[in-house]
UniProtKB/Swiss-Prot annotation:
Glycans are attached at residues 72, 127. This is Uncharacterized protein F13C5.5. Residues 1-14 form the signal peptide. It is a single-pass type I membrane protein. The keyword rRNA-binding does not apply. The chain crosses the membrane at residues 183-203. The lineage of its organism: Eukaryota, Metazoa, Ecdysozoa, Nematoda, Chromadorea. Residues 15-182 are extracellular. Keywords: Glycoprotein, Membrane, Signal, Transmembrane, Transmembrane helix.
Amino acid sequence: MRFFAVLLVPLVFAEICPMDKHAICNTGHLSCTCSVSQEDEAPVPEISCNALIARDLETGNFPVVSVEFDLNNSAEALEEFPEDAFRDKISSSLRVDEEDVIVLRTSCVGTDDTLTIQFVILKKDTNSSALPFAIEDLIDAESIATRMKAMGHLSQIANLDVDTIEYTEELVDLEFEPSNLELIFKAILLALIFGFFFVLGVWKLTKKGDEYADDLQKP
């Protein structure tokens, strides 16, 4: 019984992952949708964060810093990604202005215990209104990732445990598409849970019926 209770816990208590609402990142004219949730039936409230950057026309790639967080032991009380605290930590560590830190992705990539944040940092002389930003408008993402890896205090950012810090040109998809195998597994799991409680209910009703019949047969 305890096993099934554990399985149902993520459905009852809100946590960062999995996301049940569309995620909006940044503020002002740079506010954009950085993650689309399949659970949220509401229209996407802001433009895609893809509109902020001049991605490669053929591959859709763009150089970013990618930070992967392990949520297993550090996100129990959080219902959403603490963007302000993240931005504050990055800006103070790298000595850049907070408003120059542009978050492009906040994604659970189909997991309950991993959060991926992808971001870029504007150069000081970049006009933040001149969209989309080209690679030349940004501080080199690879050098940022290298500097962050060398900073021991960045093993935790915004009270979240950091798993990896990497330079990449592959942006995480705005909307995670689960594989057919994953969908089948979840369907089977739900069917097993439903079947267990159904059989348990029938057994209890049958047991009560037998006890009632025994009482009637008593002199």
